[in-house]
Amino acid sequence: MLAPRRKTRQLMVGKVGVGSDHPISVQSMTTTKTHDINGTLQQIAQLTATGCDIVRVACPKTVDAEALPIIAKKSPIPVIADIHFQPKYIFAAIDAGCAAVRVNPGNIKEFDGRVKEVAKAAGDAGIPIRIGVNGGSLDKRILDKYHGKATPEALVESAMWEAGLFEEHGFGDIAISVKHSDPVLMVEAYRQLAEQSDYPLHLGVTEAGPKFMGTIKSSVAFGALLSQGIGDTIRVSLSADPVEEIKVGDQILQSLNLRPRKLEIVSCPSCGRAQVDVYSLAEEVTEALDGMEVPLRVAVMGCVVNGPGEARDADLGVASGNGKGQIFVKGEVIKTVPESQIVETLIEEAMRIAEEMDPEVLAAASASGMKAEVKVTK
């Protein structure tokens, strides 16, 4: 069982609530040049269609800051401006109507001396600030204290120091992240931070790596924290198309039952008993049913040992063998079809089951914005 959600203060990032009273949101960051307004909005549209709740955009140059008003206005989801080095872009982002601003206190010039101004500007605009501490860019003062090592304690101290400065100026609409490329250190930092504050926490493993490695690192870290009730919004950082970040983030939350499940494909890992190419069949079924936004579990099994017996919890499935497929519903075989007709038959049965579902169940599933993913089981 998952631990109860950690109680936090509540923030609004545009129309998206962040904190323990709200569902855990999934974020991503655009990879376009922000001053390429059309390209950036197009990528935001793709992310939104995949289920992204909040999007972050970089703002390294004046031309990027000048593009923020149009992007913030036209984006279908809240836009967070990601600010490094130059404090002037914080104020530009606030004036542009961004839903929030992420600041990196480790590399913004003379940031401590500008906190009072930032707090007033953000407070007047009614938007939150995320203090985004990163193991790769800690404040030199903190690094010196911890002998040049970005320890969990160093990350937490940096975040709490900056949050304290904002609080001194009467500003408390703060979210915090303490990211590290090492999932173990990252998890420990968030655990310590959760014990010391009630700020909403944005989870992330920074520099997680390419799609496969990054997915593993983020899944391990997020699973450890979310199962303990820690975490209010997440971003899976991948060296890949940002759309993949949303797919992985959605699946992590679904796997922990922190979002309503939609279509789920379960498949056996295959073995010497398999009498069909399970890998190809599972991919074909996934592709055929992708986008079918219903809470339906479909099993693809390579022999009669794994299905329907081991897949009895599936709503629908197939057990293959001898050039045929046994189609089963809720563990009961309803028909046997030639191998060439398996995918077609599963589509037909999935549509039939979906049509018979309770409209309220369908509405709840539709609201979560999920799509199909393959889940391999033993």
Curated annotation (Swiss-Prot):
Record's cofactor remark: Binds 1 [4Fe-4S] cluster.
EC class (word): oxidoreductase
The keyword Hydrolase is annotated on this UniProt entry: no
Reaction catalysed by this enzyme: (2E)-4-hydroxy-3-methylbut-2-enyl diphosphate + oxidized [flavodoxin] + H2O + 2 H(+) = 2-C-methyl-D-erythritol 2,4-cyclic diphosphate + reduced [flavodoxin]
Chain residues that bind [4Fe-4S] cluster: C268, C271, C303, E310
Gene Ontology biological process terms, A to Z: isopentenyl diphosphate biosynthetic process, methylerythritol 4-phosphate pathway; terpenoid biosynthetic process
Keyword field contains Lyase: no
Record GO terms (molecular function): 4 iron, 4 sulfur cluster binding; 4-hydroxy-3-methylbut-2-en-1-yl diphosphate synthase activity (ferredoxin); 4-hydroxy-3-methylbut-2-enyl-diphosphate synthase activity (flavodoxin); iron ion binding
One Pfam family per UniProt: GcpE
Gene3D superfamilies for this protein: Dihydropteroate synthase-like, Sulfite Reductase Hemoprotein, domain 1
InterPro entries linked: Dihydropteroate_synth-like_sf (IPR011005), IspG_bac (IPR016425), IspG_bac-typ (IPR004588), NO2/SO3_Rdtase_4Fe4S_sf (IPR045854)
Keyword annotations of the record: 4Fe-4S, Iron, Iron-sulfur, Isoprene biosynthesis, Metal-binding, Oxidoreductase
Cofactor: [4Fe-4S] cluster
EC number assigned by the record: 1.17.7.3
Pathway annotation from the record: Isoprenoid biosynthesis; isopentenyl diphosphate biosynthesis via DXP pathway; isopentenyl diphosphate from 1-deoxy-D-xylulose 5-phosphate: step 5/6
Source domain of life: Bacteria
Chain's role: Converts 2C-methyl-D-erythritol 2,4-cyclodiphosphate (ME-2,4cPP) into 1-hydroxy-2-methyl-2-(E)-butenyl 4-diphosphate.
UniProt similarity note: Belongs to the IspG family.
Entries under PANTHER family matching the protein: 4-HYDROXY-3-METHYLBUT-2-EN-1-YL DIPHOSPHATE SYNTHASE, 4-HYDROXY-3-METHYLBUT-2-EN-1-YL DIPHOSPHATE SYNTHASE (FERREDOXIN), CHLOROPLASTIC
Protein name: 4-hydroxy-3-methylbut-2-en-1-yl diphosphate synthase (flavodoxin)
Organism listed in the record: Corynebacterium glutamicum (strain ATCC 13032 / DSM 20300 / JCM 1318 / BCRC 11384 / CCUG 27702 / LMG 3730 / NBRC 12168 / NCIMB 10025 / NRRL B-2784 / 534)
Gene: ispG
